[in-house]
Amino acid sequence: MKTKAKMSPKKKIVIAVGAVVVVLTAALLFVSNYLVNYAIGRSGDGGDREVALEVEASPDSVEAIIETNRAQYSADIDAFAATHPGENVTLTAADGLTLHGVRYANAETAATHRWAIVLHGYRGDHTGVLNLAMPYYEAGYQVIAPDLRACGDSDGDYVGMGWLDREDILRWIDFILADDPQAEIVVHGISMGAATTMMTAGEDTPENVKVFIEDCGYTSVWDVFSSEL
C-alpha cells in the first residue's frame, strides 16, 4: 500500500507565497483598471462630477455681489448661445479619431484674421467655454471651440489630460490656416484645457499662433488624480 509523500514545509511556504502573489496581483489589476476607467475612461464614474458654484451669502457681502454678477454673466452666455448656435465642424486626428468642434464665424470682422481656439476642462465639452467664446466673438474674433478627445461629440475612449490633445490642437490650427492663411491665433484653455494649451505651446507651432493663455491649469497629472481619486 502506497503512502502519500508528505509535503515539505519549504514547499508549503512556496505555494502559500505564490497564492498570495497571485491574489495580490489580481487585486492590483482590478483596482488599477477601475481607477483608470474612473479617472480618464469616457464612461467612467468620474464623469458624474459636479462643481457647486453657489455660495451662501448675506445681501451686503462680497459673495452676494459675485453671485449677482455671475447670474448676469450666465444669462448673457445663455443669450449668446441662443443667438449664436455656431457651426459643427470635424477633423481627423493623427490616430484616426473624428474630433468635433463648434465654429463661431464672425462675418463682420473676418478681414481682421483674428482667431481664438478655446479649450474646455476635465470631463467638459465645448459648451463649458462659452464664457470664453462670447467675449472673443464680441471682440471680433472667429472662434473655434473643440470637444477634446473622449469628450462631447468627439471620438475616443480615454480623456487625454492634455498630452494626447496637444497634437489634436495642432490639427485645429491647421484647420484654421486652411481657411485663413493669414490668421493670427490665440489658444486659450481652462483647467485641463489650460494644460493642453501649455503642452501645445511646447510643440513647433506656426508663426500664426501669437498667444497662449493658460487659465488655472494643473501642476501635474499626479496632483489631479490624487485629488480626484
Enumerate the language-model features and the residues they cover:
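Conserved alpha/beta-hydrolase
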Residues: 135-155
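Short beta-strand element of the alpha/beta-hydrolase
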Residues: 112-121
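A short loop-to-beta-strand scaffold at the N-terminal edge of the catalytic core in hydrolase folds
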Residues: 94-105
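An N-terminal hydrophobic leader/cap segment in hydrolases
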Residues: 24-91
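The serine-hydrolase catalytic nucleophile loop
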Residues: 122-135, 148
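Hydrolase active-site cap/lid region
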Residues: 199-229
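Alpha/beta-hydrolase fold nucleophile elbow
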Residues: 180-191
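Alpha/beta-hydrolase active-site loop
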Residues: 159-180
